A protein has these predicted regions:
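Short, ordered, surface-exposed loop/turn motifs in non-cytosolic proteins
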Residues: 35-45, 50-53
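A short tyrosine-centered beta-strand micro-motif
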Residues: 65-67
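Generic hydrophobic-segment detector
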Residues: 2, 9, 41-42, 61
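Intrinsically disordered, low-complexity segments enriched in small/polar residues
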Residues: 20-29, 45-48, 59-61, 70-150
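N-terminal "first-domain core" detector
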Residues: 24-26, 30, 34-40
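Sec-dependent bacterial lipoprotein signal peptides
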Residues: 1-21
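Short, surface-exposed beta-strand/beta-hairpin micro-motifs centered on an aromatic residue
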Residues: 54-58
C-alpha cells in the first residue's frame, strides 16, 4: 500500500513539474503583421480619413538614437497634424506621440511610392504625405489593460 501511495506521489510530482515547464501563454499573441483597424483624424479640419484595415506592427531598429528600419510601412496620409487612433478589442484608443515613429524626416523625399489597399499599382504622393509606424508595445499596453480609451 505504501508503494502505491509513493508511486502516486511521484507521478503527481512529475505531472506538476512537467506543467511548470510549459511556456506561459500570453493574453493575445502579437504578430509582426497584426490586422488592426486604424483611423486617422485630422483635428484641425475635423475630418476622419478612411481607415486602412491592414496595419504593420514591426520591431524598431535604432542606430545612434535615430530610427533606421521597420519591417513594413503602416499607413500613408497627406494631412498635417493628425490624431492617430486605433480600434482594438471594440474600443478606440488615441495613440500617444511616444508610440508613433515619424518616417518622413528626410528633406530629399519629394514623393513616396506606396501601394493602395485596392490596387497593386504604386501611387505617387507629394512631399506633404507622411508614413507613420505604430510601435508594437502600444498594442501590448492596450492588451494588458494599461491604456485608457479616448
Amino acid at each position: 500500500m505504501k508503494k502505491i501511495h509513493f508511486s502516486l506521489l511521484m507521478l503527481a510530482i512529475v505531472v506538476i513539474c512537467t506543467s511548470c515547464k510549459r511556456e506561459p501563454q500570453p493574453m493575445a499573441y502579437i504578430t509582426s503583421h497584426l490586422n488592426v483597424p486604424i483611423t486617422l483624424y485630422n483635428e484641425k479640419d475635423s475630418v476622419f480619413l478612411a481607415p486602412m484595415q491592414r496595419t504593420y506592427l514591426c520591431d524598431v531598429e535604432v542606430e545612434n538614437g535615430k530610427f533606421t528600419h521597420c519591417g513594413g510601412v503602416n499607413w500613408t496620409f497627406c494631412v498635417f497634424d493628425p490624431v492617430i487612433k486605433i480600434a482594438l478589442l471594440d474600443t478606440t484608443y488615441t495613440v500617444p506621440e511616444q508610440y508613433q515613429l515619424f518616417l518622413a524626416d528626410v528633406d530629399s523625399y519629394m514623393y513616396h511610392l506606396s501601394y493602395s489597399s485596392s490596387s497593386s499599382s504604386p501611387v505617387k504622393y507629394e512631399s506633404s504625405c507622411y508614413d507613420y509606424v505604430l510601435r508594437p508595445d502600444f498594442v501590448k499596453e492596450i492588451l494588458r489593460g494599461a491604456v485608457a480609451n479616448k
